[in-house]
């Protein structure tokens, strides 16, 4: 399959548009509609529901989930790819049944608003938050993390709206059928693999956290701490002085 460039997808997201993101063949091997939560409209939600036909979800960071008391849907996550669903929600104000395109758009806007309190969300509801990993696709090569990375790269807050793409036969669209869908709706299509390469090329993966003095019986040393955002641990180094 021939994919569009990550740069072109970021430009589309920045304009408030939608793109298709494909994960690896050895994973779910599915394409999802993805856009920035900050830019979502009722028309976007209607398109996802009508043309995408999958579950409409919103990716959120761990701090956002904690602030809004978005508890895990299941404490013991045994799903195949450990997708971190929280309990589903609806916005308390400005919605009716919660399922309409306008209601779901309102709920998404409520989730990403800095003014929102836990009490502003009813549980359960019709929007499904998913908590993304710190480090994005460098830590987990999933659609959740890809949507967060793309939104951030486009200058929005770190949250995306995602929806799987299902065909007329009720099965996931893949391969040539997914490309036809992208062409029909004039959508960019990218791979998570390319997004990983893009981030590794453009960003500093290892970041210095702190430098402290470490006194020992052999003398004082400088202990340097580094965070590798692609893994879940910290590196420690003890630089030596050249002879």
PLM feature spans:
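Catalytic domains of riboflavin
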Residues: 1-236
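Single conserved hydrophobic/aromatic residue that forms the stacking wall/gate
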Residues: 235-243
């Amino acid at each position: 399959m021939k994919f569009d460039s990550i740069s072109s997808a970021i430009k589309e997201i920045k304009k408030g548009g939608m793109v298709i993101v494909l994960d690896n063949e050895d994973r779910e091997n599915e394409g999802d509609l993805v856009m920035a939560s900050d830019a979502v409209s009722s028309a976007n939600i209607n398109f996802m529901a009508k043309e995408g036909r999958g579950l409409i979800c919103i990716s959120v960071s761990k701090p956002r989930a904690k602030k809004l008391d978005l508890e895990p849907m299941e404490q013991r996550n045994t799903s195949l790819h450990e997708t971190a669903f929280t309990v589903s929600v609806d916005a308390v104000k400005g919605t009716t049944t919660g399922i309409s395109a306008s209601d779901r758009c309102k709920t998404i806007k409520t989730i990403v608003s800095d003014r929102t309190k836990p009490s502003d969300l009813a549980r359960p509801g019709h929007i499904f938050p998913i908590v993304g990993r710190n480090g994005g696709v460098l830590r987990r090569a999933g659609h959740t993390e890809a949507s967060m990375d793309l939104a951030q790269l486009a200058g929005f807050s770190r949250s995306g709206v995602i929806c799987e793409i299902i065909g007329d036969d009720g099965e996931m669209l893949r391969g040539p059928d997914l490309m036809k869908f992208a062409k029909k709706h004039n959508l960019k299509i990218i791979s998570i693999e390319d997004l990983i390469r893009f981030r590794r090329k453009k960003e500093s993966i290892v970041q210095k956290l702190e430098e402290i003095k470490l006194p020992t019986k052999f003398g004082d040393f400088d202990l340097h701490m580094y965070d590798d955002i692609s893994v879940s641990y910290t590196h420690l180094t003890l630089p030596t002085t050249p002879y």
